[in-house]
Every structure is written in structure tokens, then in C-alpha cells.
Amino acid sequence: MPQLHTPVTLPPSPPRLGYGQQALSFGSCFSEHIGAYLRDGGLQLQVNPLGIQYNPLSIAAGIERLFFGERFTEADLFEYGGLYHTFLHHGRFSAPTAEEALRLMNASYEAVQTALPQLRSLLLTYGTAYVYRLAGDEYGGVVRRVVSNCHKLPERTFVRERVSLETLLATWRPLIERLRERFPELTIIQTVSPVRHLRDGAHGNALSKATLLLLSEILTEQFPATCFYFPSYELVLDELRDYRFYAEDMVHPSHLA
């Protein structure tokens, strides 16, 4: 029988997630689905404590705040459309009052703080190298800061760009050093989401994914005792190279995949 897929070789000794260990997952919508499967399997895993974050700069900013920063206050909030938001959180943390928004945000912050003493693994899912930066300070944010969520603000509020590999490395190298210093036994498992972002066309998506793959590769090479790569992207695009394994939008992996 002819072989109808391209086998993908898994890393020889990928780090294993223990049932008694704490793990945190940050990243795109793909991480939400994988995280649900892992939790259903009995792992102690908190998934996206700030909500979905698609790009590595937002993920890094979220880790910085939750691991090394303070609780959220009214100074972090802005109001738009009858709801209070931050540029670091997903819309599921937004609320009609500042008090309720801060309650939701700080409950998640405290849950992370509780998990940190036993933290052993970080799961990072990079979705895209395209980011939205604040074009001005109209909503209290810092100009040029990358946001995790646009919260349906007017398009003029942001500048969209594909960040360079050099920019990503300049953020992640010092962050990993800081994490290694505080959590000597920490393992960081990186993966690239196979979900395609086609706003910029197939070629634009390929450039974005290539940037993320290079980021993962370089960090794995430079921090071999801490950083690892799991080939989710390759497994879906090669081993599951059949549209039966895609949802109706032909972009997201299906439940069968």
C-alpha cells in the first residue's frame, strides 16, 4: 500500500510532564485545545492565565507580569464600549465595572502565584509573528507597545507589522535567563501553532511561521537544558496532510486531527 503521509520524527528525549508537577501554558487558540486534552488527562496545568495570546512578544510580556510583576490595578485599565479592559488580557477578562474586571484579572494572577513554587514546565505556543502596536496613547497605553488583544478599538489605534527574528530574540533571551535563575529546574516546551493566518496570504503566513520556527530553533540551541521544541506544526502539515483533518474553515485542525 502506498504511503500517503510524510512521517515526522519526534525529538529523541522530549521532556515529560509529570502528574504531580505544576505546568503553565501560554499562547494561541491551539494551546487552548491542547491544554484541555492535557487537563482531561489529569495534568496540573493552567492554560492561558491572561487569555489567548498569539504572538511571542505578548506571551513574553504576560510571563513578565505574572511571574515578576504586581497585581493589576485601575492604572492598568481603560474603558471602551461599556467594558473595562487591559491590553494584556483577552476579552474574557473584560467587565462592565473596574472592580469586576480587576477581580477576574487578579484571581488569575493569584492562581499563577500559587502555582509558581511548584512550577516545572512552561508550554509556549507561538501563533504568528504579526503584532499590533499602539499608534498613540489615546487609551492610556505606551506608544509602540505590543498588545495582546485589540478589544475592537478603531483600526487607527494600532500599527500592524511582522516583527523580526532579532526583535524576538532580544526579548526572549534575557527573559529565559531570568526564568532559569528563579526556576533552575524549569523546562520550556515550545511549539508553533499549525493554524494558518491567511490575512497576508499564504506567503505572508509562511514568512510568519518561519520566523517562529527560527525563534524556537535558536532558543533550543542556546538553552539546551531548558528549551525544547515539539513539532506540532510539522505533525499537522505533514503527517496529517489531508483536508479531512481540517475544520470547515480549512484553517484550524479538526477534532479528528
Task: List PLM regions with ranges.
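Extracellular glycan-modifying ectodomains
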Residues: 1-257
